[in-house]
Amino acid sequence: MNKAFLIRVLAILLTVSLFSSGGCSSGEVAYDKLRERMVRDQIGARGVSDRLVIDAMMKVPRHLFVPPDLRGLAYIDNPLPIGEGQTISQPYIVALMTQSLGLKGGERVFEVGTGSGYQAAVLAEIVDTVFTVEIIPELAERAQALLDTLGYGNVQVRAGDGYEGWPEKAPFDGVIVTAAAPRIPDPLLDQLKVGGRIVIPIEDGYQELQVHEKTAEGLELLFTLPVRFVPMKGKVRDSRTR
């Protein structure tokens, strides 16, 4: 049996257990309780303390951003497949990356790699506007439809290559990249305000999450962490090293 099949079997078993237990009067209440536990045990207990981030993670219904047959696994701390060879990041990493942007509220943030739209939704609970680009058109369309349905009118999704950024909407207070790149794309730095941060997984034999702050002199590295992301596609693969 392959891994994908086992994941789906586990999801079905957990879903049956979840909705047959006597402690929850409805499916949404059950998901609310699982989300509370996720935030407490997987996020808060591991050092994510920014109140804006905690509140955002409590509000966004992660189970709606995964395939229906995987909703029983939505609140465990693991990435999950969302189709097209892509994944939704584990909740802790989403919270950590969001906290690493140093958001205060009211910002304009650019995201590379919309995927399911979950990271964009978390950001949208905090900032003024999220601009997000997805290289796979089917995912971009699906994410925009879901975000619209959930009332996230402050998220704009575009299908395209995130390497180029979104110059018409720049400059940005923060940039977040949800796929591993061999280097930081120049256009993303050009479109980032001085004082803003970029959070990006970099692959160079292995992957590490890097958090940089843009200064008048260049970039200041603030933080690194070993991670594992799907690779960033498109022009970044043949771009020159900065």
What are these model-predicted stretches?
Residues 102-219:
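Conserved nucleotide-cofactor-binding alpha/beta core module
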Residues 65-82, 87:
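Short, surface-exposed glycine/acidic/tryptophan-bearing loops
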Residues 9-21:
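Bacterial N-terminal signal peptides
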Residues 203-242:
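Active-site capping/gating segments
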Residues 1-10:
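Bacterial N-terminal signal peptides that target proteins for export
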Residues 40, 77, 88-107:
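Conserved alpha-helix/loop element of class I SAM-dependent methyltransferases that forms part
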Residues 18, 23-69, 203:
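N-terminal auxiliary segments of SAM/dcSAM-dependent transferases
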Residues 41-46, 56, 60-63, 100, ...:
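Structured segments of extracytoplasmic/periplasmic soluble domains
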